[in-house]
Amino acid sequence: MIYDFKAEIIKAKNSSFSKSGSHHWLLQRVTGVILALCSFWLIYFMFTNKNNDINIIMWEFKKPFNIVILLITVTISLYHSVLGMRVVIEDYINCHKLRNTLIIIVKLFCILTIVSFVVAIFYSG
């Protein structure tokens, strides 16, 4: 019994998600660094407002700098989670149709969450 490695390599190359592993690795690291930097802001914000009333905290969140950093934090964290979930799904789900469906569902969920967050931030009274 000789295992046909060429057939497996061809099958892997023809997969829709086997484009560039190094690009995916780099994106995972870059989003991780951005999240680490944003977490410093979040920790600072929490400690400086720990004794404040909820109205003061909401007023602080409505400042443009804080809105931008919060949007970056949520967007990058969801994108980082999409990258991680994609790797897990590709590694552990063997059925190609189920794999592709789950990846699309995860992406749609994260897009819907980001859009909902943006709407909630900009349309809160």
From Swiss-Prot:
Keywords: Cell inner membrane, Cell membrane, Electron transport, Heme, Iron, Membrane, Metal-binding, Transmembrane, Transmembrane helix, Transport, Tricarboxylic acid cycle. GO terms for cellular component: plasma membrane. Heme binds at residue 80. GO terms for molecular function: electron transfer activity; heme binding; metal ion binding. It is a multi-pass membrane protein. The chain crosses the membrane at residues 25-45, 68-89, 100-123. Its cofactor is heme. Residues 46-67 are periplasmic. This is Succinate dehydrogenase hydrophobic membrane anchor subunit. A ubiquinone binds at residue 92. Residues 1-24, 90-99 are cytoplasmic. The gene is sdhD. GO terms for biological process: cytochrome complex assembly; tricarboxylic acid cycle. Part of an enzyme complex containing four subunits: a flavoprotein, an iron-sulfur protein, plus two membrane-anchoring proteins, SdhC and SdhD. Its main location: membrane. SUPFAM superfamilies: Fumarate reductase respiratory complex transmembrane subunits. Pfam families: Sdh_cyt. InterPro entries: SQR/QFR_C/D, Succ_DH_anchor, SuccDH_FuR_B_TM-su. It is found in: Cell inner membrane. The heme is bound between the two transmembrane subunits. Membrane-anchoring subunit of succinate dehydrogenase (SDH).
